[in-house]
Amino acid sequence: AYTGRGDLEHLDEALVAGLDAGMTVNEIKEILVQAYAYVGFPRSLLALQTFMTLLDERKAAGINDTIGKEATPVPDMDDTTKYALGKKNLAELSGVPADAPASGYAVFAPVIDKFLKEHLFADIFDRDILSWQARELATVSVITGVGGVEPMATAHMGICLHQGLPPDQLSALLNIIEINLGPEYTMPLRPVVE
């Protein structure tokens, strides 16, 4: 949530907590890289720089964090194949059939639908460092931290539920966000898990 909000001071503390809880360096990097798709390059890059500085400080203090596995390279594909993969991944992720008619922004600005399917749901979601459940939990956290994007946050919470995350796990995430950012960020989202 701190990445979405751009709160680097508190992000640093959350990164320490993640490492201390057993997350690997590569798992955290993957979350921060994926965040750019939801909050833009500036916040993602600043979060990555914050993480780099933290790792340097920990190393200097004699703390050796677990790097973790590297992502299996996503095969090179032409745009048509990549679009088809992204479309398939999105359908599996959301439960919305791949052949459902386009609507909303996908009709108004078809190029954004192309970018989402080829890049976010093929290039990023096909990487194997994080499960889809972990990616969606991270997405809910990041976009909730942005504030004012409740329709997106509730949609991603629905995807979490579709992916088999229990409502109490989403509720626990909202509790953590509420403790750290305040109830104004979480109250509009509570009906999804109640």
How should each PLM-predicted stretch be described?
Residues 1-8, 23, 39-40, 142-149, ...:
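Short alpha-helix boundary/capping elements
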Residues 3-20, 43-132, 162, 175-194:
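Acidic, glycine/proline-rich low-complexity segments that act as flexible tails and inter-domain linkers
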Residues 22-29, 131, 164-169:
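Helix N-cap / loop-to-helix initiation motif
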Residues 30, 34, 39-42:
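Substrate/cofactor-recognition hotspot
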Residues 130-131, 146-153, 163-167:
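Short amphipathic alpha-helix initiation/capping segments at coil-to-helix junctions
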